[in-house]
């Protein structure tokens, strides 16, 4: 057997007839499959045992030889070799065709490869191959031309005229003869000459032909192999036939298609032997051609062959194509053993790294381990009795199971797995019942809730797999989100609410101003009802041993609340005492204003101090991030568990519920509504008098009602008591927001109709008062649209992720430093005056390209190639520096991937990225996963041109697919000055730009908004009108860097507007993949063809080679490809074929004799090899473990 891990590369090519015969173990002569009485395969049929091997292990067809001792014997009676039955999965047969037939992929594909080689149109080819016309194969010395088509009538006339001097024939035989006559070298030389002189259409045709002919010449494939003399028959186990319960047979469609070919082939042989008239033979040959076409790609030409019930049969091509094809169904996504699935329920008692596995599930999953352990412990004599013990579920089995699962992590996965946190490892604990218990804090990462979600469990078997699961995938390790480096395991809902309630402060609460010696004393007072959790009290600062106070602070009294004392118990040692929700308190120390000299009047001081806000969800997140930064993983995960327990405990104790009485009705509501109504009446009056247009009237009415709702919302929030449960829920960040509250207690406001236009009649009632029938009806539109949008969005977002993963799957950190001297200039990302992304956010975790100095003192803040961390980034910003040169994936020189320096910090771990990290896939997941949070809508602002800007998911797709954007902006192609702006006819305006050399004029629609005025100085690529730039246009007039930065800026803009943060480096990796190709304009003295697409790396290598010999290099221009196009243009044919357009990719690859170097992840998964990322990289595979223990002297037994 081939060892899959020793593959270097994989080749694909055309098979010669001899090659096909060498694969075969015998010729299939009969269309029979299985004998209906004996149920044994028929001899020489499609399932023949003599050709394909025995159906039963070690047993020949006639039964003369049985048992393994006859291994390798060929039976003298039935001719079957005695061997394993699984050879029926790998042995092929063949059919000798009575007449050559063409391969439909090469004749029918676009462009037709056969047509390009022969320089004939596909139309002409079709006429010849399907016996409609003759083609002249050898004109001899007649006036006919080679490859000329003749109809039946013309052929007869020429035969009468010239006799047998010339040769013309029809069918694939004729094409075969023409293909054999082609001299590749001569043709290529002629075409190269033609290229030098020709223009336009002829030139493009020549380039296309040259590409195909060069491919044949270089790959060693012969053009005549596109015509088949012999047809391979795939192994029978890959097209099985099985008996169903009713005695009927279920069979693969391929068997039907093969049977048609064999029947027609045998009939043709018989007709040829009988010497039948040519018209009958021709008809039979055409039918054979059609049968082979249907077998290879049914439905590609003419009507597809159908089976019972008019269903088209699945041909060989269909077996590979699409989601259900071989690539995506069986090679890239396999079903695995040692897995289970069940409903999840919450496990609040679990530790961060644990999950609860139902007992019976665990027993089934760990069965082999339990059996081994039972035998080792002597509780069973052999494996068989151990198995019996497990099946009978004897009591000792449970004890053994307990010890087996200890420290054996399992993987939990929730579909849809949108990012890498959708699969994490946990240590199992056994639980009763049949549901999996999940830790509440990992729900955010899985996007799981407990309303019936299910999860799958997988068991890592080998020691290496277990080690990887424990070290890399354990839930306690995955605290940061790979997309932005922020903690993903922040408490939510009840936990937030509990901690919020615990840290509330109230003026004048029971026992305010009491002084305590230490925390225990304060808690005792609380338990006995002398103080409340929210009471502000004083505690001796020196009693809080684990907290960092300054020496001065230690000697004083600390003003805090009882709840905050409890909250601070969960924080790690030497962390500042959290007394107010501010950045300085988290990062530096507790502010001095909370400390009193001993003996001061505590009550009086407390009475004067303002109330501090409680700790909301955001603050909890910041505390976690700071703890992670200081104390790393282990301490953070322990602290998270403590925070979770505290939150649950106090949200239970607080007993926060929602009742109708909590929804306070606003008294002023009626007045506000009446005032708004009178404003609307005014507007209507103006409209009726003709003072304003319909459009203006609509706009004003909408804005009046929006303003009224805002006023109500503002007043409502002010009128709420801060202990109102609904207010607490929304303020703490547990659930809900101000808008929900306004709808409950104020008014519902304006709604949109099904078309998305806002209805100008607002819903004046709130849910508390109840809606009228009309109002209820209007509300239903929005609800329905919301549900439909969500469903569509999920599918769109998933498909976007799939394309992103595909284009970047081979981007891996391949080396430490690529040695580039280029970088990008990082500035804050701005949209107008608003900053989308601050400079420090762009700098953190990146390597500096150039030294950064303080502009005033000249002090070096960061050296070249030094990592910029949070502190350094802050120093740079505080020094007033506005732009910094940093290393970037855009400018990295590593051929297939990125280097450590250009990538920077790994956001998921907060430390340097390792060589072998699959950063491309992480980037794709980071961009795709928030896709579902983006909106679907295109904003329409009442038909103002240039304002219908696409946003949300459609805009992201538009950018990554490099499509022409909606509402496209006009850009200038020259540097210069705007000299005039004129109105021209047809509602257009003309902008005239005068440059140093030439003057250009641009027209824009009359109502589009201009971004320039007369007299403005402008540079190439600058926008003249509002809207989105077409990046392809931008690439034509500016350089690569401008386009890269534009795409980065636009993608970040969409996500940040929706409140989603994504690290720049992820977008950079994707944009880099879109700009990897160069279109060759002039080949110079290199071997590349003009007009071809080449990888930047291959292009520079080819030029380097030519320059070293002192010749002329090729010139090219960078090309921007959309992600789908870029995926299909990848060097790996396996990756491209498994993505989309499978047959086109494979046709092309076979002709070129492509070689897949197996550099990406997909290719290796397909052939079943370890992926070249992480520990699968060759660098790590070659590491040999060496014992570092010194050998000791021989042990001496102690007497």
From Swiss-Prot:
EC number: 2.7.7.6
Keywords for this protein: Antibiotic resistance, DNA-directed RNA polymerase, Magnesium, Metal-binding, Nucleotidyltransferase, Transcription, Transferase, Zinc
Residues that, per the record, bind Zn(2+) 2: 818, 892, 899, 902
Binding site for Zn(2+) 1: 60, 62, 75, 78
Gene3D superfamilies: 1.10.132.30, 1.10.150.390, 1.10.1790.20, 1.10.40.90, 2.40.40.20, 2.40.50.100, RNA polymerase II, clamp domain, RNA polymerase Rpb1, domain 3
SMART domains: RPOLA_N
Enzyme class of the recorded protein, top EC level: transferase
Cofactor: how and how many bound: Binds 1 Mg(2+) ion per subunit. Binds 2 Zn(2+) ions per subunit.
One protein family per Pfam: RNA_pol_Rpb1_5
Binding site for Mg(2+): 449, 451, 453
GO cellular component terms attached to this protein's record: DNA-directed RNA polymerase complex
GO MF, any single term: DNA-directed RNA polymerase activity
Biological processes, Gene Ontology terms: DNA-templated transcription; response to antibiotic
Cofactor(s) needed for function: Mg(2+); Zn(2+)
Catalytic activity of the protein: RNA(n) + a ribonucleoside 5'-triphosphate = RNA(n+1) + diphosphate
Highest taxon listed in the record's lineage: Bacteria
Record-annotated disulphide pairs: none
Family: Belongs to the RNA polymerase beta' chain family.
PANTHER family in the cross-refs: DNA-DIRECTED RNA POLYMERASE, DNA-DIRECTED RNA POLYMERASE SUBUNIT BETA
Subunit structure: RNAP is composed of a core of 2 alpha, a beta and a beta' subunit. The core is associated with a delta subunit, and at least one of epsilon or omega. When a sigma factor is associated with the core the holoenzyme is formed, which can initiate transcription.
The protein's role, per its UniProt record: DNA-dependent RNA polymerase catalyzes the transcription of DNA into RNA using the four ribonucleoside triphosphates as substrates.
Protein known as: DNA-directed RNA polymerase subunit beta'
Taxonomy of the source species: Bacteria, Bacillati, Bacillota, Bacilli, Bacillales
